[in-house]
Amino acid sequence: MNQILLCSQILLLLFAVANCDGEHQLDSSMDLKSDSTKSAVLKNVAPKNDATQAEIAKDDVALKSGKKGDYVMDIDVCTMPLDDYPINNSKSRKNSSTLPSQILTDKPNQGSNQIALKALKHRLLMEQNNNLFLRNHSVSLMNEIEARKTDIIQARQLNIDLELELEALKRKLSEMNAQNARKPTKSCKKRPSKDIAPPANQLQEVIVKNTYRNKYLTLLTQLAQKINYEIANVNNPATDVPTGKSPSEGNPSTT
């Protein structure tokens, strides 16, 4: 790409040099025509400047590096129209408008320069088209590279997801193996409660509970006897004979 841009710059430089050379030759013809002392000796038309064309061909890098069959060497410049690619140069137009009609019609002097200019213009156009093609091709390659990068990123993300899923499966498999390893193991048998002696405080608590339970049952029995005795006295008041016993003792036969 750098070599192509360099060739384009060289072609532009050669185009400018050839244009200046043509203007210089036209100005020289005007000076020779206006000089009255040399008008009888010199001709109106300057000789063909083959040295300039040889110098242009010598300094042209594209012609040196061009191979046989290249598009630069195969151009038929004689068939190209002369009004193609007009030169946008106001100075040359001004000078050409002031030239006499006799100098403007001297085509043998300008033929070689015009052919060289047309060839340079055509070559410049071809280089520009080639640059545009290469630029479009580079853009398409960059787009393809970006698409490949996107595919690579997606593939990496997919690999990461697969690795995470594989780790989860390994974890589940290890848990299942641990559960299978626990199943064959037998649990320790507990000793029967009869063989185990209760602690001292537990025994003391049992004794206290039994004592209070017995006292409660005794009081409940005495209360029942007293109630029965009082009911009997209410039903039979005439037969109430004092026995000398306290009412609280009750009748033992009424249980």
UniProtKB/Swiss-Prot annotation:
RNA-binding recorded as keyword: no
Gene label: Acp26Aa
One cellular component term from this protein's GO annotations in UniProt: extracellular region
Protein name per its UniProtKB record: Accessory gland-specific peptide 26Aa
Cellular compartments annotated: Secreted, Extracellular space
UniProt main location, coarse: secreted
Sites where a glycan is attached: N88, N95, N136
InterPro entries per the UniProt record, alphabetical: Male_ac_gland_sc
Comp. bias (Polar residues): 87-110, 245-255
GO biological process, one term: positive regulation of ovulation
Function comment: This protein is transferred from male to female's hemolymph during mating, affecting egglaying and behavior after mating.
Example GO molecular function: identical protein binding
UniProt tissue specificity: Main cells of the accessory glands of males.
Free-text description of this protein's post-translational modifications in UniProt: It undergoes several cleavages as it is secreted and it is further processed in the recipient female.
Superkingdom of the source species: Eukaryota
Region (Disordered): 86-110, 177-197, 235-255
Ranges annotated as biased composition (Basic residues): 183-192
One Pfam family matching this protein: MAGSP
Signal peptide start and end residues: 1-18
